[in-house]
Amino acid sequence: MATFKVTLINEAEGTKHEIEVPDDEYILDAAEEQGYDLPFSCRAGACSTCAGKLVSGTVDQSDQSFLDDDQIEAGYVLTCVAYPTSDVVIQTHKEEDLY
C-alpha cells in the first residue's frame, strides 16, 4: 500500500495543509481523521458539496456519479470518493465554481 502527500489549499481562508493519505482511503476521510474540516454532504459522490479542484497530481474517483466529463477534464474532484494515485495538490471549497 502506497501513501501519498495530499496538499489541501483553501484560498478563501488562506490555509494550506499537508496530510498523508493511503492509496486505499478517501481524501475526505483522511483529512477528517487528521483534524481538518472539509465540506461534505452525501459521502457517496452523488452531490457537489465536497468538490475541489486538482492543481497537480492524479486521483481515482471512479466511485463518483455527479461530475460530468467536462468537469473531470477541468480538474474537479469529489474528495469524499477520491483516492490519491500520486502526490496531489487540491484547492478545496470549489462547489460554487462548478456552476
From Swiss-Prot:
GO terms (BP aspect): electron transport chain
Consequence recorded when altering residue 66 to A/I: 1000-fold decrease in electron transfer
Matching PROSITE patterns: 2FE2S_FER_1, 2FE2S_FER_2
Functional summary from the UniProt entry: Ferredoxins are iron-sulfur proteins that transfer electrons in a wide variety of metabolic reactions.
Organism per entry: Nostoc sp. (strain PCC 7120 / SAG 25.82 / UTEX 2576)
Gene that encodes the chain: petF
Protein name: Ferredoxin-1
Binding locations of [2Fe-2S] cluster: 42, 47, 50, 80
The keyword Electron transport is annotated on this UniProt entry: yes
Cofactor: [2Fe-2S] cluster
Family to which this protein belongs: Belongs to the 2Fe2S plant-type ferredoxin family.
